C-alpha cells in the first residue's frame, strides 16, 4: 500500500477520533470523573454508603468511554511513529502491519460511534429477556428454545454474562417460557429493540407430512432497574404462588416448593424465579423483576400515547411482529428495518448485530 494512501487513512482516523471526543462529551466526562474522585477523597462521604455506591457506578460508566477513547489515541500515536520508521527504513513489512492496525482502530472507532445510540435513561443497565411460546403448539415451544439459544449465543459473543432465572419446559420439546438475565455494558441498550413477535416459517419436523408450519414466540426485553426507582407495588395487588422447580437443577429439584411465581393482578404481569434453592431469594428476585416490568410498562404507555398524538397508526397484530425467519427459503427479514440475512444458521447462532444496529440507527 502506498505511503500517501496510509497517511490519508490515518488522517481520517484522527478526524473521526476528534469528532468522537466531541459528541461523546469527552471533556465533560473527564471533568466529572475528577469531581467524583474529589468527592470520594472525603472521609465523611463514606458514611453515605448508597451515595458512594452510585458515585462509583457513575464513574465506572464514564471510564468505559474515556478509557476506550484514550486507548484509540494511544494506538494512533503509536501507528504514526511506526509509519515514520517505515518511511525511514523503507520496510514493507512494517507498512503491512500498519495497514492491518488501521482496520483494527477503525473498528474500535466504529464501535464507539455507535454508543451515540444509547441515549435512553436505562440503556446502560443490565436487562432481562422473557421468551414466551405463542401459537403453533409444539413448533412454537421448539422455536422458543431456538430463540433462547440465539440470544445466549449473541450475549456470549458480546462478552456479556447470562443467567437463566426461570424456565418452563415444553410438553414434548422446547420451552413454554423462560427468563434470562443479561449482564454487561449497555446490555439493555443493545437488546431493547428486540422486543416483539418473532415468526418462524418452516417444514415442521413434528409433522409426518413435512408440511409448512408457522409458529410464533414473543420476546420482551426490560432493564434491570435499581431498587431506588420509585415503583410502588401494593402487596394486595400481588398473588404469590410457590411450586416445585422443573428442569435441570440437581438433587434438590422437585423436592421442595422453592420456585416462586408472582402475578400483578391489575395488569396480569407475571414474573417467576426458580434458580435459587431458597424460596425467600426467589421471591426477592421475582419482586425485583416485577418492578422492572412495571417500570418498562409505564415507559411503553408513554410512547404509545405519543404515537397516538402523532397519529402513527398500524395494525397491532402485524405491528408487533418484528422479524420473520423463513428457514425453507434460507431468509430472515426484519419487518421494521427491511434488513435481510440469508445465512440462517449464522443468525440462529447469534449473528444479530446487523438487525440490532439498524433498528437503533432508525430510532425504533
Swiss-Prot record:
Family: Belongs to the prokaryotic/mitochondrial release factor family.
Entry's localization field: Cytoplasm
Entry-linked InterPro entries: PCRF, Pep_chain_release_fac_I, Pep_chain_release_fac_I_sf, PrfB
N5-methylglutamine: residues carrying this PTM: 251
Alphabetized Pfam families for the sequence: PCRF, RF-1
Broad class of the protein's primary localization: cytoplasm
GO biological process terms on file: viral translational frameshifting
PTM text: Methylated by PrmC. Methylation increases the termination efficiency of RF2.
GO CC annotations on file: cytoplasm
Highest taxon of source: Bacteria
Entry's Gene Ontology molecular function annotations: translation release factor activity, codon specific
Native source species: Buchnera aphidicola subsp. Schizaphis graminum (strain Sg)
Other comments on record: The gene for this protein contains a UGA in-frame termination codon after Leu-24; a naturally occurring frameshift enables complete translation of RF-2. This provides a mechanism for the protein to regulate its own production.
Role description: Peptide chain release factor 2 directs the termination of translation in response to the peptide chain termination codons UGA and UAA.
Keywords of this entry: Cytoplasm, Methylation, Protein biosynthesis
Protein name (record): Peptide chain release factor 2
Amino acid at each position: 500500500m502506498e505511503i500517501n494512501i496510509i497517511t490519508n487513512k490515518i488522517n481520517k482516523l484522527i478526524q473521526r477520533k476528534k469528532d468522537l471526543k466531541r459528541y461523546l462529551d469527552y471533556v465533560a466526562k473527564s471533568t466529572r470523573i475528577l469531581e467524583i474522585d474529589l468527592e470520594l477523597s472525603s472521609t465523611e462521604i463514606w458514611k453515605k454508603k448508597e451515595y458512594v455506591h452510585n458515585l462509583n457506578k457513575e464513574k465506572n460508566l464514564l471510564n468505559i468511554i474515556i478509557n476506550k477513547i484514550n486507548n484509540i489515541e494511544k494506538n494512533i500515536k503509536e501507528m504514526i511513529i511506526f509509519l515514520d520508521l517505515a518511511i525511514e527504513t523503507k520496510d514493507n513489512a512494517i507498512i503491512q502491519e500498519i495497514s492491518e492496525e488501521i482496520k483494527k482502530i477503525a473498528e474500535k472507532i466504529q464501535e464507539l460511534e455507535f454508543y451515540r445510540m444509547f441515549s435512553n435513561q436505562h440503556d446502560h443497565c443490565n436487562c432481562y429477556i422473557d421468551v414466551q411460546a405463542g401459537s403453533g403448539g409444539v413448533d412454537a415451544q421448539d422455536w422458543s428454545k431456538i430463540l433462547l439459544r440465539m440470544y445466549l449465543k449473541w450475549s456470549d459473543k458480546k462478552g456479556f454474562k447470562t443467567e437463566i432465572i426461570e424456565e418452563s419446559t415444553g410438553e414434548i420439546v422446547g420451552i413454554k417460557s423462560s427468563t434470562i438475565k443479561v449482564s454487561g455494558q449497555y446490555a439493555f441498550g443493545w437488546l431493547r429493540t428486540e422486543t416483539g413477535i418473532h415468526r418462524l416459517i418452516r417444514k415442521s419436523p413434528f409433522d409426518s407430512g413435512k408440511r409448512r408450519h408457522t409458529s410464533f414466540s414473543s420476546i420482551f426485553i426490560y432493564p434491570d432497574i435499581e431498587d431506588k426507582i420509585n415503583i410502588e407495588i401494593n402487596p394486595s395487588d400481588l398473588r404469590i404462588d410457590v411450586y416445585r422447580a422443573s428442569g435441570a437443577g440437581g438433587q434438590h429439584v422437585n423436592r421442595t416448593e422453592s420456585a416462586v411465581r408472582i402475578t400483578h393482578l391489575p395488569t396480569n404481569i407475571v414474573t417467576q424465579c426458580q434458580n435459587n434453592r431458597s424460596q425467600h431469594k426467589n421471591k426477592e428476585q421475582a419482586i425485583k423483576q416485577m418492578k422492572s416490568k412495571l417500570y418498562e410498562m409505564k415507559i411503553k404507555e408513554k410512547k404509545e400515547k405519543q404515537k397516538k398524538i402523532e397519529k402513527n397508526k398500524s395494525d397491532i397484530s402485524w405491528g408487533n411482529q418484528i422479524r420473520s425467519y423463513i428457514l425453507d427459503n434460507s431468509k430472515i427479514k426484519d419487518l421494521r428495518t427491511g434488513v435481510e440475512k440469508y445465512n440462517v444458521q449464522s443468525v440462529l447462532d447469534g449473528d444479530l448485530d446487523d438487525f440490532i444496529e439498524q433498528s437503533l440507527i432508525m430510532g425504533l
